[in-house]
Design a protein with these regions (language model features):
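Cytosolic, long alpha-helical scaffolding segments
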Residues: 1-171
Length: 171
């Protein structure tokens, strides 16, 4: 917990430094590129925010007297795995990996929608209570937004380096 909070502070400080550096760019092309770096820095900072939110909500669930169902725990494990995979893909974003980030983000969106529906069904059938359902739903949302920010970063990197291959997100 302390390590995650420390890293979040580091990310916030780096974000501020990147924005300051990008604002100092002089040429028109450099200004366009620095704008993309500012967007990337902002998305990276948001990744840290969502990771912190997930940690805090998991601690609230852990500290409560009500556990999540086995299914809900498995769903959170799946979302965690998907999030780690997209982060790994983002770290190695070159060439065709940009398309992989897009595909992974779509998997996260699909899992989010499925798991949200399943949680509603569990609530309706009283398999689980409302105590931690709100936290569960917010954790799902944080994972989904984490995927969105990873895709944003990949797209912004593609703008900076257009020679990289990337398939635009299909709606």
């Amino acid at each position: 917990v302390a390590e995650l909070k420390s890293r979040e502070q580091d990310i916030d400080e780096l974000n501020q430094q990147i924005v300051q550096y990008a604002a100092m760019s002089l040429t028109h092309d450099a200004n366009l590129q620095s704008g993309e770096y500012v967007k990337i820095a902002s998305d990276l900072e948001r990744l840290g925010d969502h990771a912190t939110n997930i940690m805090e909500r998991l601690l609230l669930i852990h500290d409560s007297k009500h556990d999540l169902s086995e299914e809900a725990l498995e769903e959170l494990a799946t979302m965690s795995r998907l999030a780690l995979e997209i982060l790994d893909q983002l770290k190695e974003t070159v060439g065709d990996n940009l398309e992989e980030v897009n595909n992974q983000e779509q998997l996260i969106d699909q899992a989010y929608e499925t798991f949200e529906r399943m949680q509603i069904q569990r609530l309706k059938s009283k398999v689980c209570g409302t105590s931690n359902s709100v936290h569960f739903a917010k954790i799902l949302t944080d994972f989904e937004r984490l995927g969105d920010h990873c895709l944003n970063i990949a797209q912004e990197m593609n703008t900076i380096h257009p020679s990289w291959k990337f398939v635009e997100q299909q709606d």
